[in-house]
Amino acid sequence: MNRLSPDQDRPCTASARIAFAALADYLDPILASIATHDMTVMPDGDAYRVTAAFGQATLRALPGELLIQVQTRDRQALNRMKHALAGPVGFIAARERLHIEWTGDTGGLAPLADLRVVRVAAVQALTPHLRRIVFQGDDLAHLDRADQLHCRLIFAPTGDAAPVWPMLDDAGRVVWPGGKMATRVYTPVSY
């Protein structure tokens, strides 16, 4: 692995060769899932080209394995691209218990690009089991879209004025350097 220093932002590359005997059963759903996460998936010869605002990748189905090659503009985008691809692969093919190991550039822990800190602005009881909760925060425009059905909220421990938020590691996995916090999935009604 090529460890990059924090001040060494340059184009980065990495790849993963995943043993995947049942790839043919999962490839189409994996590609469809990737395409629903703000990435474009296009056939490119014997492979698929994935393009996102933060990088690009090639996915190639080989006999018994999936080869993923990524290229990004900097080290933070590298972990984000790994997460954006390994996440759907691991989720869609969860029963296969795939081992995804990356080689190439690494950049250390990187912040979650979509993480926003919000505060409760108001709470209104609608029924005994349903509440309307209004949140306030900065830079929330990315949530205001028709295809954004759910969001995950992370609850910092009560009284913790400086929580350590989750990060992305060199494998593109979400890690909790300060310990895992409670999370819930919510369905917003309006923004």
Q: Language model features by range: what are they?
A:
Residues 1-12, 26, 46, 52-64, ...:
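Long, contiguous binding/interaction regions
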Residues 1-42:
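Short Lys/Arg-enriched alpha/beta "domain-start" segment
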Residues 12-19, 115-123, 132-136:
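Short amphipathic
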Residues 16-22, 69-74, 137:
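Short beta-strand-to-loop capping motifs
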Residues 30, 68, 120, 148, ...:
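A residue-level signal for conserved active-site and pocket-lining positions in enzyme catalytic cores
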Residues 79-94:
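C-terminal structural segments of small proteins and small subunits
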Residues 107-117, 176-185:
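Short coil-to-beta-strand transition motifs
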Residues 123-191:
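Ferredoxin-reductase
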